[in-house]
Curated annotation (Swiss-Prot):
Record's keyword terms, sorted: Host nucleus
GO cellular component terms listed in the entry, alphabetical order: host cell nucleus
Stored InterPro entries: Herpes_UL4
Subcellular location as annotated: Host nucleus
Top-level taxon in the UniProt lineage: Viruses
Family according to the record: Belongs to the alphaherpesvirinae HHV-1 UL4 family.
Protein name as catalogued: Nuclear protein UL4
């Protein structure tokens, strides 16, 4: 697939299961977490934000794998669309680790909604005190993708790449949210014709 173009990584600390934690045997998993972080890396830029207490939903559906992170003020929902409607998270049985390759994905946050015909892989790692959810998105659509007639996504920053702090790992609080910026760039990308309009427009 080549080098990843965008990585979105969540670390959710001190999770407590509201329903079930057996991903392969359940259609839905609901957890509450006490705190967390969200990191976004794209084309030389990086940002990490702290997340307050919130909830996470991971759900198998006929239209893909849903991941919802809801911290009230911070909200983002993702739908990762696999190559078959029966595709499930694949588990490496010697570890609490799951993988879900996808051919396209949909994401919605506060004020932004977008669909992208680009492939990648979602991984979910469970530890006793943290859930790690990472979406690695590549800049070219797979040759075997079906139902996607659009050109590959090429996410380009509208401003020169900013250097990543080697110590803090976070940008100032007043910096524009990089995830929202990435979603907005995908939405207005002239190479992607099927971007969803912003809700309410």
């Amino acid at each position: 697939m080549g080098n990843p173009q965008t990585t979105i990584a969540y670390s959710l600390h001190h999770p407590r299961a509201s329903l079930t934690s057996a991903l392969p045997d359940a259609a839905q998993v609901v957890h509450v977490f006490e705190s967390g972080t969200r990191a976004v890396l794209t084309r030389g830029r990086a940002r990490q934000d702290r997340l307050p207490r919130g909830g996470v939903v991971i759900q198998h559906t006929p239209i893909g794998l849903l991941v919802i992170i809801d911290c009230r003020a911070e909200f983002c929902a993702y739908r990762f669309i696999g190559r078959a409607s029966t595709q499930r998270l694949e588990r490496w049985w010697d570890a609490h680790m799951y993988a879900y390759p996808f051919d396209s994905w949909v994401s919605s946050s506060h004020g932004e909604s977008v669909r992208s015909a680009t492939a990648g892989i979602l991984t979910v790692v469970w530890t006793p005190d943290t859930i790690y959810i990472t979406a690695t998105i590549y800049g070219t659509a797979p040759e075997a993708a079906r139902g996607c007639d659009n050109a590959p996504l090429d996410v380009r920053p509208t401003t020169p790449p900013a250097p990543v702090s080697p110590t803090a790992g976070e940008f100032p609080a007043n910096t524009t949210d990089l995830l929202v910026e990435v979603l907005r760039e995908i939405q207005i990308s002239p190479t992607l014709d099927d971007a969803d309009p912003t809700p309410g427009t």
